[in-house]
Amino acid sequence: MRKLLALVLNVALRASLVLFLADAILNADDSRFAGKGIGSRGLVILPLSLLLPALYLTRRRGEPYPFWMDNLYLSIFALDLAGNSFDLYNSYRHFDLLPHAHGTGAATVLFAWLLQRPMLSAVGLATALHVGLEAQEYYSDVLFGLANVRGTWDVVNDLVVGVVGSAVYGAGYLWLVRARGAGGTT
């Protein structure tokens, strides 16, 4: 039953990515999407959404497909895109703190699991990735006139909640791994 639920959720997440991106492209002038470069992001998000299946096919053949980890990975993109489609970024000033906390926290777990690295290393990798993403958001606004960042306070708060997300998700993952007696370097 858990495998079926994981598969259904995986298909739903993948379908939601396509639907959210189609909505953003077809309604690019809508205030939910205007000035955010979501169509361009889609060119990056869709190929990135296939990263875990590609890694599985090349490195983990013979093992069961890690649907729950793939779902965690896909949820990073789905939450970000849902925030735009449902106009949450514009309606709630601090909504973006949720995707930043979740995205960095989820990346921490994925790095620890996928790379079999100690949790502190995974936190460092996820935080470095998050700093790079935040810099990309800021400089795409400055250089290309987009509207993803509301000011320095927005950048600082996004980075702070990213670190908090890494700590919370990392601690949760360590607890689950230990509770299940699973192996791996964490």
Please report, for each region that a protein language model flagged, where it lies by residue.
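Membrane-interface capping segments at transmembrane-helix boundaries
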Residues: L174-T185
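Generic alpha-helical structural signal
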Residues: K3, Y73, T127-H130, G151
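"…centered on the first transmembrane helix and the immediately adjacent amphipathic helix/loop
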Residues: R2-H102, V109
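Membrane-interfacial alpha-helical segments at the cytosolic side of multi-pass membrane proteins
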Residues: H102-R117, V142-N148, V163-L176
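Interfacial helix-loop-helix junctions of multi-pass membrane proteins
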Residues: D87-D96, V131, A135-A167
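Membrane-proximal helix-loop-helix units in multi-pass membrane proteins
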Residues: A82-Y138
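Physicochemical signature of membrane-embedded alpha-helices that form the seven-helix bundle of GPCRs
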Residues: L5-L9, L129, N157
